[in-house]
Amino acid sequence: MSRNSTTMIPKRIASIRFGLMDPTEIRKMSSVEVKTADTYKDDGHAYRQGLMDPHMGVIEPGLLCPTDNCKYDESPGHFGHIQLELPVIHIGFVNLIKTALKATCNSCSKILLHDADGTHPSNPGLSEQDYYRARVRDIITKHGVGSTEFSKIIKEIEKKTSEAKRTICMHCKSQQGKIVLDKPTTFKENIAAQGGGKATERKLNARDIREWLQGIPKEHLIFLGMNKENRPEWIILKVLPVPPITVRPSITLDSGDRSEDDLTHKLVDVLRINQRLRENRDAGAPQLIVEDLWELLQYHVTTYFDNQTSGIPPARHRSGRTLKTLTQRLKGKEGRFRSNLSGKRVNSVSYTHLTLPTSYAV
């Protein structure tokens, strides 16, 4: 080739940055809103806005994907989304939620660090916020966000903001409580009564937490270990992405029946409870019933992400087999990274043995 092969690459990927996704962005990239838990009709065609809607990709020869007009072996598949009736907590970010709640005010959502000049430990012309902001930026520059030093400084800030003497917010003068996490996703705030009375306990649901996190100023996100491009309230899910059908294909058995993937089974549970929750809210059901269904929705979304979460029973198939959901599909020796991407196994392999002719004297 006379032409340099590198010139044929229009862009080079310098790095990949992982972050939180805006619910609006999830809806934009979605090819269809999934509303029904049904998969296939009696005639074998997929339900429109169902979990096997062809807009999310096709897996059968002869069919074209309506989204990109490609055949099954050419279409990469497309994401859909489920609009959740009530917000739920993402199990993967529980520790970040705990840090954010402990480090910020329950009323104004500002970081519980002084912003007045003279509160800097060594420089009287600067504030406590200036001190920790400079330290965090210095550690990011020298060691990076994945370093032990970065984790230590965020823990130090959390410990500083949770001191007993900071029970009153220095910004709005509101009384602060102690944040308690009952695993896996239940948060409570214990507020000590004035004058030595009995402390009050307030349970924080996902909607309360989302409103709390929504008020955190973007210039205070650095104290939580976050950058300004991400928002902490995105940890509380209002929209659930649905993976393409190519990621969770159904299998046709010898009997002619279809066997669905474990992820599809779990998404069916999410959709059914989400629909029941919507119907009960529309019918004006008692708050107790709504809260029970809300907790059940939280359980199904949690086990969809990680079916080995401590403190709750794992989701199972009708046969009693434990479902293999997203975390189990990726992690461990049998997961995608170690088994598939780093694996050395191939479909076919051949060996050869080269030797010298016997007439050669060696």
Label every PLM stretch briefly.
Residues 1-351, 359:
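Conserved core architecture of multi-subunit DNA-directed RNA polymerases
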